[in-house]
Amino acid sequence: MYDVLIIGGGNAGISAAARLLKKGVSDVAVIEPKQVHTYKPLLSYVGAGQAPLTEAERTQRSVTPEGCVWLEDSVVSVDPAERSVRCASGMEYGYRDLVLGQGLIADEAALPGVHAALRFPDVASNYLDRAERTWRLVRDLPAHSHAVFTVPRPPVGCTGTTVKPLFLAAAHWKRTGRLPTVDITLVVDRESLLGVPDLDPRLAGHLRDLGVRVLMDTAVAALEPESKRITVTDHAGVDERIDYDMLHLVPPYRGPLWVQESGLAGEQPHGVVDIDSRTMRHRRHPEVWAAGDGAAIDTDSSGGALRKQISVLVDNLVASRSGGAMSSYDGYTVAPIAVEAHTLIAAEFDRTGALASSLPSFLDPLKPRRSAWAFDRYGLPQSYWHMILAGRL
């Protein structure tokens, strides 16, 4: 039995483990099957030819904090009543408190054939371990071709990052003289792109300037990679078949099946963990906590949001043991969207969609800036490896 058992060895799990250890919780274990830990935000730049994949990866062992046990295994079920977790190896682990940072998986029930489509050379996804292919397709796409990009319905890891590949690809095609001859289509399965009234019109303007055909409130309904074609369905139920020369696919996502089967999702759609989005504590099981993409956080997920969530989660977990006051997560998040090769909008907002900029009030918080791009490309990765995963930021 572990004092704190953490499911998921990504940003949420590792940073939570580091913070817990710093607060004196000594018996901490992380369940994570992968041997490679990836800094996912950097994959946008891998897909744009601005970063090598090796810069986004470390071994899982190297990022696991000293004093934390790494259980190299996959979770198959959780019994919150018994406080136990069963793994694919057959091992079962008990816990006093359970922290869920399991993230999301592609929802093959909502869009069949996602992983099969990735076997075709014209389909790529920065979200599904194909960022290097994204760059090859962007680099080699001929003039007079058609590129299609997709944005799924929630939940998804950082909605802003779903449109980053389009803008960075367009910047490359523009720089190499292939725009405006490359046709670009963006399929967005939601009524508004980010649901931020001040930001969405700005992004729409950038898309218009690039001549992008935007299909709002439209879902990818079927994949035909052998024919280089997708079928989309709009809000009125009207189907359209779209041929492509390049498809950047961000599929619909859901929580792992064991979340729902274990009763941890409650009434939440798509199998995300049913937590109080202010305290990060499960609504029915007080010894269960969750953060990140796979939790019902009631705001757009992002690395900036997760850093604040983990701080609140760890503080509250420790406080719950001593009867201390609980902290509250205010819903802060950030959408770092590169709209040119070397300029970026760092849009900060809260769970209501209101801007929550950390910039001085006299500066336009939605202006694309080269400094914001440089921080996103070079500063944040260093902060991630050396500060965030170490529980120091």
Where are these regions (language model features)?
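FAD-site-proximal beta/loop scaffold in flavoenzymes
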Residues: 110, 115-143, 243-308
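FAD-binding beta-loop-beta segment adjacent to the flavin cofactor pocket
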Residues: 271-288, 339-353, 357-359
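C-terminal auxiliary extensions adjacent to catalytic cores
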Residues: 346-393
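A Rossmann-like FAD-binding core segment of flavoenzymes
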Residues: 68-78, 85, 93, 174-271, ...
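Short, electropositive alpha-helical surface patch
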Residues: 154-172, 303-312, 344-347, 351
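Beta1-alpha1 glycine-rich phosphate/pyrophosphate-binding loop at the start
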Residues: 1-69, 153-197
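A conserved FAD-binding loop/helix module that cradles the flavin
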Residues: 291-339
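FAD-binding core/adjacent interface of flavoenzyme oxidoreductases
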Residues: 68-164, 168-177, 237, 248
